[in-house]
């Protein structure tokens, strides 16, 4: 930073203009040395001569220098400054040292000038060319620093990109390794560790079978809207029905049980479902649980605990099917407090264990509901086109549905019904009670000739209930707490004792007609 020039200094400065100097940083070594020497000479010539007044003032200041030094030591080290005598009497070497100090410590010099100015010492007058030197050098340094910063940024960016690429490669390797490990584990599980639950193994084999079953003609895409393709939906339902149900030898492990005791148990379960206003599906699920438990259980079921089996089965089915199932304490009260809640829960664990946790079979009630929904015809719109209805909406009269449901309820009492699947029993009941036959075939997917044996078995029961209906003129039961559009789904009690003689007489009559080669008439 150049000091202010006095009038005397201006007189002694030569008027000749020196050529403009370039940046010393970019000059060769010899040129730099010569120019530094010239600068030192110029500075020496520009130092002002002191008069007597200035010398007296300087002596007074020198006398006080020791005092100021003492004060300055308290405040910190004094800033560096070059005395006037050193500039006046110094040699060329001293000037070179000063210039080297000034060129190396430019930043320190600016702070030193501020401190020296406050202490009253005059600053050496710097030529204007030095300012040009500083500006050019600072601009060059700035350019170099910017270039170096850019280089550093580029290097950092390259490093980051390399790290990202390495991480991506590592992730790909991890994914490949995980996939290989998963395949190895899966192959080990399939080969060395078979499914422990045999029921699940059968279900897995059937459900994963690629063979597709042709869907009935009435099962269109519109009726399966939101479910899936008709072929796939029907195939899954049929495969689910192929899971074996209980057989007629289900009481082989229970010597104290017989067919009559089983009928008594099912009769009581039906009465409980009616009193608690449970749905028909709940009753059919509970009976299925009881039958499969009796066939697979090694725990002997006797007259002392067979009611407990039915109670626990109802408790499980209600939790599976009902929105608001009764509590365990409610079922305990229905047994006249013969069993506690702990007894029911213990038996519940045993039932789900022995039936293999397979709690959702497609019962005959579900198949019948599906067939009737497929038989429903579409409604005409204003343009005289038929609109296909969703398969969830039943179209047949509820009274006919109730009559066929009672037939399926009664068939649960008979051991011989285990010979046939739920799907075929529901289709046979529909063949006997509904016309035309071609429509039933399109809804069930069966030809009538395929179900000849099943139809022969269910026909006497269907005719017995048709006679009973004409005598009693049954109506749909009404419940105050149940909505009218759901009342036909509530289980009703079928008087087994009054229906068994009628069914027996009908079977004898049909056998007599067949012996005479006569065919019975249609019911409806």
UniProtKB/Swiss-Prot annotation:
Transmembrane segments: none annotated. It is found in: Nucleus; Cytoplasm, Cytoskeleton, Microtubule organizing center, Centrosome, Centriole. GO terms for molecular function: cyclin-dependent protein serine/threonine kinase regulator activity. Residues 18-47, 63-78, 86-95, 146-155 have a biased composition (Basic and acidic residues). Residues 48-62 have a biased composition (Polar residues). It comes from the Eukaryota. Gene3D superfamilies: Cyclin-like. Disruption phenotype: Loss of cell division in vulval lineages as a result of lengthened intervals between cell divisons. RNAi-mediated knockdown results in arrest prior to the 100-cell embryonic stage. Depending on the knockdown, some animals reach adult age. In the 1-cell embryo, persistent ruffling throughout the embryo cortex and mislocalization of par-2, which remains cytoplasmic, and par-6, which is distributed throughout the cortex. In 50 percent of embryos, the first division is symmetric. Adult mutants are sterile due to a lack of sperm and egg production. Keywords: Cell cycle, Cell division, Cyclin, Cytoplasm, Cytoskeleton, Meiosis, Mitosis, Nucleus. The keyword DNA repair does not apply. Belongs to the cyclin family. Cyclin E subfamily. Interacts with a member of the CDK2/CDK protein kinases to form a serine/threonine kinase holoenzyme complex. The cyclin subunit imparts substrate specificity to the complex. Essential for the control of the cell cycle at the G1/S (start) transition. In association with cdk-2, regulates proliferation, quiescent state and cell fate during the development of several cell lineages. In the embryo, initiates the establishment of cell polarity through the recruitment of the centrosomal proteins spd-2 and spd-5 during prophase. During the development of the vulva, controls the onset of vulval cell terminal differentiation by controlling the duration of G1 phase. During hypoderm development at early larval stages, controls syncytial fate of seam cell daughter cells. This is G1/S-specific cyclin-E. It comes from Caenorhabditis elegans. The lineage of its organism: Eukaryota, Metazoa, Ecdysozoa, Nematoda, Chromadorea.
């Amino acid at each position: 930073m150049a000091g202010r020039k006095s009038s005397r200094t201006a007189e002694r400065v030569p008027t000749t203009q020196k050529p403009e100097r370039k940046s010393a940083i970019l000059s060769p070594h010899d040129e730099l040395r010569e120019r530094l020497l010239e600068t030192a000479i110029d500075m020496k010539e520009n130092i002002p001569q002191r008069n007597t007044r200035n010398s007296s003032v300087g002596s007074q200041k020198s006398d006080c220098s020791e005092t100021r030094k003492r004060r300055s030591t308290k405040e910190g080290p004094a800033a560096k400054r070059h005395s006037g005598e050193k500039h006046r009497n110094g040699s060329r070497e001293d000037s070179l040292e000063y210039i080297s100090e000034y060129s190396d410590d430019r930043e320190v010099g600016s702070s030193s000038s501020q401190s020296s100015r406050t202490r009253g010492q005059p600053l050496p007058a710097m030529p204007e060319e030095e300012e040009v030197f500083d500006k050019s050098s600072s601009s060059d340094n700035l350019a170099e620093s910017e270039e170096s910063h850019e280089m550093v940024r580029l290097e950092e960016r390259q490093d980051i990109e390399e790290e990202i690429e390495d991480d991506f490669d590592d992730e790909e390797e991890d994914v490949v390794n995980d996939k290989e490990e998963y395949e190895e584990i899966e192959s080990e599980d399939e080969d060395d560790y078979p499914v422990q639950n045999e029921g699940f193994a059968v279900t897995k084999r059937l459900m994963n079978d690629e063979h597709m079953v042709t869907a009935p003609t009435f099962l269109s895409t519109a009726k399966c809207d939101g479910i899936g393709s008709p072929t796939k939906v029907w195939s899954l339902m049929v495969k689910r029905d192929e899971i074996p149900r209980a057989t007629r030898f289900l009481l082989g492990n229970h010597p104290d049980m017989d067919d009559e005791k089983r009928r008594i148990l099912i009769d009581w379960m039906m009465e409980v479902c009616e009193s608690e206003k449970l749905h028909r599906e709940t009753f059919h699920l509970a009976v299925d649980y009881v039958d499969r438990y009796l066939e697979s259980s090694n725990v002997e079921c006797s007259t002392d605990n067979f009611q407990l089996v039915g109670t626990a089965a109802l408790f499980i089915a209600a939790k599976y099917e009902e929105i608001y199932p009764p509590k365990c304490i409610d079922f305990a009260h229905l047994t006249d407090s013969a069993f506690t809640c702990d007894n029911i829960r213990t038996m519940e664990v045993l039932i789900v264990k022995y039936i293999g946790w397979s709690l959702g079979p497609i019962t005959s009630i579900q198949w019948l509901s599906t067939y009737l929904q497929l038989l429903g015809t579409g409604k005409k719109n204003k343009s005289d086109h038929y609109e296909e209805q969703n398969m969830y909406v039943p179209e047949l009269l509820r009274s006919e549905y109730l009559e066929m449901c009672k037939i399926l309820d009664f068939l649960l009492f008979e051991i011989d019904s285990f010979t046939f699947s739920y799907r075929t029993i529901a289709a046979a009941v529909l063949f006997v009670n509904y016309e035309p036959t071609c429509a039933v075939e399109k809804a069930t997917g069966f030809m009538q000739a395929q179900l000849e044996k099943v139809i022969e078995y269910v026909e006497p029961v269907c005719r017995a209930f048709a006679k009973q209906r004409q005598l009693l003129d049954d109506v749909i039961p009404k419940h105050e707490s149940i909505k009218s559009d759901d009342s036909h789904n509530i289980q009703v009690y079928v008087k087994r004792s009054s229906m068994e003689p009628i069914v027996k007489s009908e079977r004898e009559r049909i056998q007599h007609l067949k012996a005479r080669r006569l065919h019975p008439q249609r019911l409806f």
